[in-house]
A protein has these predicted regions:
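Helix-start/capping segments and mature chain N-termini
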Residues: 1-99, 119, 126-343
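Charged, gly/pro-rich active-site loop segments
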Residues: 99-111
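Extended, Lys/Arg-enriched charged tracts that mediate electrostatic binding to polyanionic substrates
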Residues: 109-121
Length: 343
């Protein structure tokens, strides 16, 4: 394992390159190493950079990747918005399977999972505001510790941002474009200085409707109904967001995707019908929320009780992840079985 700033990366990575005249090279596995790039590479000046998050885990002693096709199709959707060439999904997944099987530094067991980071950037060396004709695509992987038991991740507090804007409909804020994350850092710093863990973003026009929490989608439980902001062109279409919607429906809960005004959440809390709030993302799956502050309104929550909907969803997801429940949704791709078939 390569240790960089407390992140332990595997010994190998995946690489392929693109030129507009010849298209994509074949994806190859090579040693994990620093990347050499020209000072005039367009990614450094005009922002053509995109990344995605994926995760793999132990499933009945087999090595499984969670929704790899969904994640890479989402990655391609981001690339299209940034006028970058889409990647060939099947060859990339096949090469990823090879990497996970041959890299002895990846210690996958019931005590950890594997974080997979595909990323792509423009490499053409020229100055001038135009799209690049050359790109580099890589995948790096690292081991991450698993929760010690089936308990939820620690609850977080949210500060509702009133001045700064994360995204508006029509821009690239709904994608995994690097700049859409960098633009959130100032608000994140200000929220932390006020004693909060993260920022709850409102829409960029009226600053009235709830959108998302930085790199997470958000859900509310009101009168035993689960509600989440509908995708509107400025909210990231998180893979875990869709996963939890499907899980909730399967558990018999009603899920509504709609515009949610922050004032309606404050009112629901005042009326005693807001019981839980949770966020979703690839790395943590579900993170409960214990406090939201909007102007002079403070909402205190207990979203991580054992009987909570948040806990039920987390357990249902973890049971599929660890093989305790059958994967009736066909979400996981079993690496070892595929490797045996191909052999």
């Amino acid at each position: 394992m390569n240790d960089e700033s407390n992140n332990k990366f595997s010994e190998y990575m995946i690489n392929m390159s693109y030129h507009s005249d010849i298209g994509w090279s074949k994806p190859v596995i090579r040693p994990y190493a620093p990347i050499t790039i020209s000072p005039s590479a367009q990614c450094l000046h005009y922002g053509q950079t995109v990344f995605e998050d994926m995760i793999a885990f132990n499933d009945k002693n087999n090595f499984s990747i969670f929704k790899p096709y969904d994640h890479l199709n989402k990655f391609n959707h981001s690339l299209t918005r940034l006028e970058m060439p889409t990647i060939p999904v099947e060859p990339v997944i096949n090469t990823l399977i090879q990497l996970l099987n041959i890299d002895s530094s990846i210690n996958i067991n019931e005590e950890n999972s594997i974080y997979i980071r595909p990323f792509m950037y423009a490499t053409e060396s020229k100055l001038g505001v135009s799209k690049s004709e050359e790109y580099n695509f890589n995948i790096i992987v690292s081991t991450i510790p698993k929760q010690s038991d089936q308990s939820l991740p620690n609850a977080i507090s949210l500060y509702v941002e009133q001045e700064l804007v994360k995204s508006i409909r029509g821009d690239a804020g709904y994608t995994q474009f690097g700049g859409s994350f960098a633009s959130q850092f100032l608000a994140q710093k200000q929220a932390e200085e006020k004693g909060y863990d993260n920022v709850l973003w409102l829409d960029g026009i009226e600053k009235k409707y709830i959108e998302e929490v930085s790199n997470k989608n958000i859900f509310f439980v009101i009168n035993n109904e689960i509600v989440t902001p509908k995708l509107n062109g400025s909210i990231k279409p998180g893979i875990m967001r869709q996963t939890m919607i499907e899980l909730a429906n399967n558990l018999g809960y009603q899920v509504s995707e709609k515009e949610i005004a922050i004032e309606d959440i404050v009112l629901a809390n005042d009326n005693g019908i807001l019981s839980e709030v949770f966020c979703t993302d690839t790395l943590n799956a579900i993170t409960p929320v214990n406090r939201i502050t909007h102007l002079n309104n403070e909402i205190i929550l207990n979203s991580n009780q054992r009987s909570s909907i948040t806990q039920q969803l987390y357990k249902a997801y973890k049971d599929i992840q660890t093989g305790k429940s059958d994967d009736i949704f066909n979400w996981t791709l079993d690496v070892k079985q595929l490797n045996e078939v191909e052999a």
